[in-house]
Amino acid sequence: MNMNLPDVTSKQLTTASLPLKWVGMEGIALPITLAEQPSSSLSAKANVFVSLDKADAKGIHMSRLYLRLKESLTNEPLTMGALTALLQTLVSSQEGLSLAARLQLDFELTIRKPALLSGQFGYQTYPVSIRCEYINEKMNTELSLSIPYSSTCPCSAALSRQAMSDAIATQFSEESVSKEALLTWISSQQGSVATPHSQRSFAYLKLQLQHNELPDFSALIKNFEDVIGTPVQTAVKREDEQAFAKLNAENLMFCEDAARRLKQALENNEKISDYWFKVEHQESLHAHNAVVIDHKFPQGYDKL
């Protein structure tokens, strides 16, 4: 039906014979399915590119990228095999114009999370990004995650304890103190002498995986949350909120503490070949953030 329609890309040559690194599309809406949640469809946005290596070609066959993307990822769960086959197909679809392809998939993963004590549960979403490059017949993959957590300042906690100690000394000046009177005072509003500052904090991670294998995303996120120790909550009742307060007291953290916990977990994970991360504590005491940035190798992170 299209045989008589003009094809400018195939028939016309460019006036400037120069190759171009990447040509493609961004923000393509696409439903995808993860192997760990095969019955659920996720809404993703895809960025897809190929190299334009034929210097005198007018442009790439862009519609072929869209069609190959749609055909490949909407019909089967997302696996490394499926991604590799797709990028190879993207290159071959250009019929000699391209030697390399790249793909980025951005989506939010929804995870069911139980409350700490009450038996309630809720849902939390986590931004996930998968970047793939197929260059020189080699596939490289990068995974990006954003994980929120709670952090309470150790210095502020110590100052709060000192303030409480001073207040008790002032309130109960006698040598001996009635246990009942002390507990009554602590439980009253007067007993709220000082509270340490805490804040919502974030770990941003970029990971390159051994053998380019896609992980179980939910399990990987939970592992990092367990390592840090203070994951944010969803549905809570009073007993959950109290348990969360205790959890924060047991895990007082400067940004350096959180970063070291995360780094140790990354170093111990044999499936991760390279990493970059940023820990960000969005301070409630200050108008600025406390930040740590680190990567695996001294020469830096080889990002895609």
Labelled PLM ranges:
Residues 1-304:
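N-terminal intrinsically disordered, cationic/polar leader segments
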